[in-house]
Regions:
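Cytosolic juxtamembrane amphipathic/interface segments immediately preceding
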Residues: 2-13
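N-terminal TM1-TM2 helical hairpin plus the immediately adjacent luminal interfacial "cap"
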Residues: 13-132
Length: 132
């Protein structure tokens, strides 16, 4: 029980940067754990694909209306180890610079606002440009 309490205490005292990184890594590890359990049980990736599909951002504006949480939850999804590795490295380096010059409190808002802006741009680009 003290292990869980230690984690809660560390998370409570962590900066916004480390909390964001911890959330991203925890979501990734949970999905990888489910994928590993399904593989060892002889199943396929159906459950993980369903979870990722439920948490990801749909490309259709109509589907976004029925899955609005995807605008926020997609920011924390990563497909493989290289994806999360490079995203966390970039978040760490830029996050340290950001918090040094603008403060710790503004990082959460900037992260979420940047993610929402990216979601809007993704949905617009997917539906406006024929390359997709």
């Amino acid at each position: 029980m003290s292990f869980i309490r230690d984690i809660q205490m560390q998370f409570g005292q962590a900066t916004a940067l480390y909390r964001l990184m911890a959330i991203n890594i925890a979501v990734f590890l949970i999905l990888m754990l489910i994928r590993t359990i399904m593989y060892l049980a002889g199943g396929d990736d159906f459950l993980v694909n369903e979870i990722v599909g439920w948490l990801s951002l749909p490309a259709s504006p109509g589907a976004v209306l029925y899955q609005p949480w995807g605008i926020v939850t997609y920011m924390f999804l990563h497909q493989d180890i290289m994806h999360i590795l490079f995203n966390m490295l970039i978040l760490f380096w830029t996050g340290r610079l950001f918090t040094e010059y603008l403060g710790n409190d503004k990082l959460w808002g900037t992260y979420v606002l940047g993610g929402i802006s990216g979601a809007i741009l993704y949905v617009l680009a997917f539906n406006l440009f024929p390359a997709f």
